A protein has these predicted regions:
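Conserved short strand/loop->alpha-helix "switch" segment adjacent to the catalytic nucleotide/phosphoryl-transfer site
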Residues: 15, 40-62
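Glycine-rich ATP-binding loops of the HATPase_c
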Residues: 132-145
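Short beta-strand/loop element within the Bergerat-fold HATPase_c
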Residues: 80-92
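Short beta-to-alpha transition helix within the HATPase_c
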Residues: 3-7, 18-35
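Glycine-rich/acidic phosphate-handling loop/turn and adjacent ATP-lid/helix
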Residues: 90-122, 149-151
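Conserved ATP-binding N-box helix of the HATPase_c
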Residues: 55-78, 130
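Conserved glycine-/histidine-rich ATP-lid loop and adjacent helix of the Bergerat-fold HATPase_c
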Residues: 123-133
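Heptad-repeat coiled-coil segments of the DHp/HisKA dimerization-phosphoacceptor module
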Residues: 43-49, 89, 100-102, 139
């Protein structure tokens, strides 16, 4: 009986992706949105409690990245759309990488003119640049990839 209760309680606890509550909250919201849209959602976050970016700006970046991924995956025309988010530290940088299914005809190359970017990408880039961060966006073979890095 107790084992069954523990399993039930564990299944009702909100997913905890990392030590950072802002990141946890954003990922939980988009995990639920992806599930509602029948999009597989995977997230691995090794973010620390404190990040080099304010909570407000972290939400602006991460929510825009994952919101774009949600729309891209929904429009991908694949039978099994997916979104994968990885947050980790490498070479004294905090890195956010988001990959999602996208329409196979979508082309997005690193040297693409900024005039062709949408509002979400402009917001991601301007917020990242505020912290000396860098961004890279690509789309190849039905996969869109957004990478944002900040000095930690």
């Amino acid at each position: 009986y107790l084992e069954k209760q523990n399993v039930e309680m564990d299944s009702q606890r909100p997913q905890r992706f990392c030590e950072n509550e802002t990141i946890n909250n954003v990922l939980r919201v988009y995990e639920a949105k992806a599930k509602a849209a029948n999009i597989r959602f995977n997230a691995n976050a090794a973010a620390r409690k404190e990040t080099p970016v304010s909570s407000h700006d972290l939400v602006a970046i991460l929510a825009n990245v994952v919101e774009n991924a949600l729309h891209g995956a929904a429009d991908s025309e694949t039978s099994e759309p997916v979104i994968s988010v990885d947050i980790y530290y490498k070479a004294k940088k905090m890195v956010i990488v988001c990959e999602n299914s996208c329409h196979p005809s979508l082309e997005f190359v690193p040297d693409m003119s900024r005039e062709l970017w949408g509002v979400g990408i402009h917001s991601i880039v301007s917020t990242a640049e505020k912290y000396g961060g860098t961004c890279r966006f690509t789309a190849q073979n039905g996969v869109f990839k957004a990478t944002v890095a900040f000095t930690s």
